[in-house]
Amino acid sequence: MENGTMTQGEGKDPTSFLGEIIGNMVTVKLNSGVIYKGELQSVDGYMNIALEKAEEWVAGQKKRSYGDAFVRGNNVMYIAASP
């Protein structure tokens, strides 16, 4: 923090960020490059993720829709809050 202002890279720890986005739309990218978009229902300490209204995207193309999806944490590259 410089001069009382947050700079990029500073801020909340990942646990509080994930807690705040529960119930919001997120994008989850897997190590394989596959992307899931959906409403974040839960995430645990191992980064296991439960999504509702999930969509699977491969190479920029929507492939499937799921009512619920569970993603094992060791496959997750990142989770991003959707704008």
Curated annotation (Swiss-Prot):
Subcellular location: Cytoplasm; Nucleus
Organism: Pyricularia oryzae (strain 70-15 / ATCC MYA-4617 / FGSC 8958) (Rice blast fungus)
InterPro entries (UniProt xref): Lsm6/sSmF, LSM_dom_sf, Sm, Sm_dom_euk/arc
GO biological process, one term: tRNA processing
Family per record: Belongs to the snRNP Sm proteins family. SmF/LSm6 subfamily.
Protein name per its UniProtKB record: U6 snRNA-associated Sm-like protein LSm6
Annotated ranges, domain Sm: 13-83
GO MF annotations, alphabetized: RNA binding
Subunit structure: Component of the heptameric LSM1-LSM7 complex, which consists of LSM1, LSM2, LSM3, LSM4, LSM5, LSM6 and LSM7. Component of the heptameric LSM2-LSM8 complex, which consists of LSM2, LSM3, LSM4, LSM5, LSM6, LSM7 and LSM8. The LSm subunits form a seven-membered ring structure with a doughnut shape.
Job description of the protein: Component of LSm protein complexes, which are involved in RNA processing and may function in a chaperone-like manner, facilitating the efficient association of RNA processing factors with their substrates. Component of the cytoplasmic LSM1-LSM7 complex, which is thought to be involved in mRNA degradation by activating the decapping step in the 5'-to-3' mRNA decay pathway. Component of the nuclear LSM2-LSM8 complex, which is involved in splicing of nuclear mRNAs.
Gene Ontology CC terms, in alphabetical order: Lsm1-7-Pat1 complex; nucleolus; P-body; sno(s)RNA-containing ribonucleoprotein complex; spliceosomal complex; U4/U6 x U5 tri-snRNP complex; U6 snRNP
Alphabetical UniProt keywords: Cytoplasm, mRNA processing, mRNA splicing, Nucleus, Ribonucleoprotein, RNA-binding, rRNA processing, Spliceosome, tRNA processing
Main location: cytoplasm
One Pfam entry name: LSM
